[in-house]
A protein has these predicted regions:
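Flexible "arm" and connector segments at domain edges
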Residues: 1-130
Length: 130
């Protein structure tokens, strides 16, 4: 799924003259870094407003916009060819949060906590791969 989404957002970036990096990078112009952050922040605020108003249409719109902007940010950082592998590694890491009996550990607010078998995702190794 992510590949199709990234391809479509890449077409948008090309059509509108927006940043597209072909190699993984954090070296972006300051204005692009700020823009990507502000776009994500804006959509998070729109999501918050939508859930406060119990407005499913606006929730769906905010989530769709978040995904679109996230794909654009992935493209800006040149991570489009790595993101599926990064996600898979994060998934493996998240599943290692179970306790020794294979049960989840929750914080009072519902956040899943790290269990004794937790391991940090090795994203650096993925970024080093050609």
């Amino acid at each position: 799924m992510i590949k199709k989404l990234v391809e479509e957002v890449t077409a948008f970036h090309h059509a509108f003259g927006l940043n597209v990096s072909t190699n993984p990078t954090v070296d972006l112009p300051e204005e692009i870094k700020k823009l990507r952050y502000n776009l994500m922040k804006e959509e998070n605020e729109e999501y918050l407003e939508a859930i406060k108003n119990d407005d499913l249409v606006e929730v769906a719109d905010a989530l769709g916009d978040m995904l679109y902007i996230l794909c654009g940010t992935i493209i800006s950082h040149g991570l489009q060819d790595k993101m599926e592998y990064i996600f898979d590694e994060i998934q493996r890491s998240n599943m290692s949060k179970l306790d020794t009996n294979g049960r989840p550990i929750y914080r009072d607010d519902g956040k899943v906590m790290k269990g004794p078998n937790y391991f940090k995702p090795n994203i650096a190794a993925i970024l080093k791969e050609p």
